[in-house]
């Protein structure tokens, strides 16, 4: 079969297209999924670059987000049939291994993928396999961060940094569905216009203005007595954006984070932390319940995942370049 392997740590030259990669066979309690689409995520790029303290067996077919149809059933599999449309939950939950599909075992950048049947989620007929493939790492993460961990409710003011990437766009869409007033930050006029089309209430081009100044102009400077600022800042950027995020929060506000793409060594101003009684809430990954809820939102016509481009498997390196050069709005998919 055709597959793209990450053969070593380094730049995009470590990606190899194979046309003779062995077809997988299902083990006990496994199925073979004929991959319709797989999403490209920064996790794939981090896997290729190498992550300190995390050993990845190489070569490996990455691609954690994938959806398709069941092509074969292993022994012991019940409740599923060949041809069933499925989304794969990438986090291995069978108790046998720790890690993710596309990390500790081959993933979706191939025509076929072997996965434990316990990882399967049925895709409603109203949902395209492309939309399903866009969900786990971006929309699943955003759902858990905003709803399960962040407790965002209607009427709250939510500032989203890095709002044009996969997780950021998902946060804007879900916060709007929750009834929040959303301020979305991005780095170009084109991305700002697309965020407006997603119904972001306010937008900030942070190459032209500081987001903390924009927030204070919109809602006023936070006051110890209450008022001003936003209720929630979604910040998975990290780096030097952390203290400015604190400066945006109203009394009792909270920062939600699921990562730190600009750097893990954060500077926190403890004065804002105690004076404004701020919360800093971490969120890690997603749940199967959240993925099912997202599929139901799509089926009901309430959510449409933002898919920027769909490229053939042969253009995997270009897909990763688009992410690395920040030329993507939402998600990029590969078609094996």
Which residues are covered by each model-predicted region?
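Glycine-rich beta-strand-centered segment in the early N-terminal region that forms part
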Residues: 22-38, 51-92, 124-126
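Residue-level marker of beta-strand positions
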Residues: 65, 84-85, 112, 157, ...
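Mid-domain Rossmann-like dinucleotide-binding core that forms the NAD(H)/NADP(H) cofactor-binding site
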Residues: 85, 130-208
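N-terminal Rossmann-like NAD(P) cofactor-binding module of classical short-chain dehydrogenase/reductase
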Residues: 87, 233-234
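Short amphipathic alpha-helix with an adjacent loop that forms part of the alpha/beta core around
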Residues: 211-227
